[in-house]
Amino acid sequence: MTDPRFDPSRHIRAPRGNQLTCKSWLTEAAYRMIQNNLDAEVAEHPQSLVVYGGIGRAARNWECYDKILETLRRLEDDETLLVQSGKPVGVFKTHENAPRVLIANSNLVPHWANWEHFNELDKKGLMMYGQMTAGSWIYIGSQGIVQGTYETFFAVANQHFGGKPQGRWILTGGLGGMGGAQPLAATMAGFSMIAVECDETRIDFRLKTRYVDRKATTLDEALAIVEDAKQSGKAVSVGLLGNAADVFAELVARGITPDVVTDQTSAHDPVHGYLPQGWTVAQWRDKQKTAAAEITAAAKKSMAVQVRAMLTLQQRGAATLDYGNNIRQMALEEGVENAFDFPGFVPAYVRPLFCEGIGPFRWVALSGDPEDIYKTDQKVKELIPDDPHLHNWLDMAKERIAFQGLPARICWVGLKDRARLGQAFNEMVKNGELKAPIVIGRDHLDSGSVASPNRETESMRDGSDAVSDWPLLNALLNTAGGATWVSLHHGGGVGMGFSQHSGVVIVCDGTDAASERLGRVLRNDPGTGVMRHADAGYDIAVNCAREQGLDLPMLK
């Protein structure tokens, strides 16, 4: 039987320039961004519609993809397209300030919210796994998580090494769409890194895009490269071909302790995201369609081996953190009772930023011209002049990050800055400084847009880790505020049953109406994050809410 999700003839690239294919820039933005998600420079397996994160897709199948594009081309300025798990299911009359697209991906009634039920529906063609930015059409390649990873490693250096990471190294696993950001983020923060990856093509892709410096095929070779870099006073990243469980356990056996240990394999998806020990990549992929239960059992057993190694390395002095792929949960289910003894990265390092609504703000130049991004970089510096850490990030990003697909930038800013940046970008479009409109979005990993007890909302002060009202309110408010497209997903990052989250995208097309929408959406969206954390009792969030004039009725 032919797989409707695989088409080797597809080679997708988003349109560039300032000529419209659709009836307005609002629909043109969605039209270009879904295609950009599937650009070979951007996506992990574009001919299978897979963008990143195991099986995170942009559309349910190729028929649905084609119909989405066809519908966007004819969509009027007062109509809204509804997309259900990657399938365009309806167009309804709304109004000009309503979203042009509303997306719901991978959502299941809680009792049935597990991989087994999802996989049944997926096989029947009734669902699609949207991950976070795959199915919401705002993935920008590995840059999308570079700064968040950099900020985390920067915080690790400050907390554990007195702000001096030089000569120290990080051990991790996974060089996929998300994990591929780790090597560059590490060297930007001053650490060396060994990143274990079982798929050699992924290592080669990260070499090509300059996210990793070197490739090694043995642990000895990788260790030698890191040691040479230490002696020369430089930071280096190494993609090591191998199985993460094997390598982590081997380091324990040898008595070698890295300075920092983490993991970004796609452990959230035990069928498609984690190679079991003793299996070849070819065997693993061959069995994915026919032996899901066998793979799951073998993968979780191997995850337990890796997590036990991480716990041992933690006991030996390594700063050890979970990077949000749910590997601790998988190991716990496999009998590793103390799997959660090492913390997740959000409560350990990132939550103070979330309390101020600071998170992964990103924008894309629909013109396709990198100069538009460089001009917006400069505008950010002008509007936020007293933040040397942010300026340093922008300088490093310009120098070291290769654009994938349409030129884009990510920049962690919060409640006090997002709206004015968006409106400034809109003014640049209006006065012709930029060659075409800018589209602004963010990861679903943000301060007010996700409920994920093993990641973003782990160890909330008031115990509200699993309360998922917050991302629902976020999506509703962004819809009411006039975002260009809004998405509501389940299972991103940590897998089925473990998260709910929402996404938002808004277009700067240079119009006065856009400026008003930007002012609403880019204040409200991070404002819900400050609200959520203030409600949970975080003083930083309470103070931020007061300083920024948020109206929170229960705030004392």
From Swiss-Prot:
The record's GO molecular-function terms, alphabetically, read:
urocanate hydratase activity
Q: Which cofactor does it need?
A: NAD(+)
How would you classify this enzyme at the top EC level?
A: lyase
Q: Does the record bear Ribonucleoprotein in its keywords?
A: no
Which PROSITE patterns is this protein grouped with?
UROCANASE (PS01233)
What does the record give as its pathway?
Amino-acid degradation; L-histidine degradation into L-glutamate; N-formimidoyl-L-glutamate from L-histidine: step 2/3
Listed Basic and acidic residues bias regions: 455-464
Any Pfam family from its record, for instance, is Urocanase_C
This chain's function reads: Catalyzes the conversion of urocanate to 4-imidazolone-5-propionate.
Family as reported in the entry's similarity comment:
Belongs to the urocanase family.
Name this polypeptide is given: Urocanate hydratase
Q: Which organism is it from?
A: Chromobacterium violaceum (strain ATCC 12472 / DSM 30191 / JCM 1249 / CCUG 213 / NBRC 12614 / NCIMB 9131 / NCTC 9757 / MK)
